[in-house]
Amino acid sequence: MQTDTNICLNCGAGSARDARLCANCAAPLVLDSKGSVAVWRLGEVRPEVLDGIARMIGKSLGLPVVVQPALLDPRPSRRPDWRGASATAFLNQVDRRAGSGKGRGTVFSLGITEENIVPGSAWNYLFGYAYLGQPSCVVTLHQMSSDSPSLRHLVRRAATIAIHEIGHNCGLDHHGYDEGIACVMTADTELDCLERLDEGTHRFCRACQLVVDRKLAGLRS
């Protein structure tokens, strides 16, 4: 029995990951995302938040953003004894979809969820998670929604984290806070919090932007 299906938002049925249409109701599940940022959802995500994040990412990277109609199967990432879903399992689900079927040619694959995600049982929360130099990353709205921000504020937070994680996909590492660089890649896992996130920027510094531009140029060639 397959345990990582795509879930139809229309009828709730599961279908194979490479199925374009729902096996039960024929609703679309996977759209062509070649040359785009593909967005996958683990559970339902507020449409107005999702739309705002997609707009900011598209503007930052100069790429179209395709929100896939299907939801990710929640079973692989469930960890009943943890404080959230497994960030690694969630990321692996997104990564598996990046290179198969309609996902072939996707520039980056981004997972978004309203659930809390953690990399292990000792963790309380994450903002995002990524593979360095690989084309997949995930973002959670859970912690950044904890102080009931406005829609605009939440979208900015989430888009900032998404752009940061895509920076890791491009091979970028962190700047330290002590460097005083205004860049979306400024971070420290021991210091990161909502206050730090709100003080930062969603833009790359000049040096990081050059790396991202070279990466995108290579992918387009």
Residue ranges and their predicted role:
Residues 127-157, 173-221:
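Metalloprotease/metallohydrolase-associated module, dominated by Zn2+-dependent proteases
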Residues 32-46:
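Fold-level signature of zinc-dependent metallopeptidase catalytic domains
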Residues 7, 14, 21, 184, ...:
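The −1 position to Zn-ligating cysteines in a subset of zinc-ribbon hairpins
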Residues 4, 18, 163, 201:
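Short metal-coordination and nucleic-acid-contact micro-motifs, chiefly zinc-binding Cys/His arrays
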Residues 14-16, 30, 175, 213:
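Short functional micro-motifs and their immediate structural scaffolds
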Residues 12, 26, 206-209:
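Cys/His-coordinated zinc-binding microdomains
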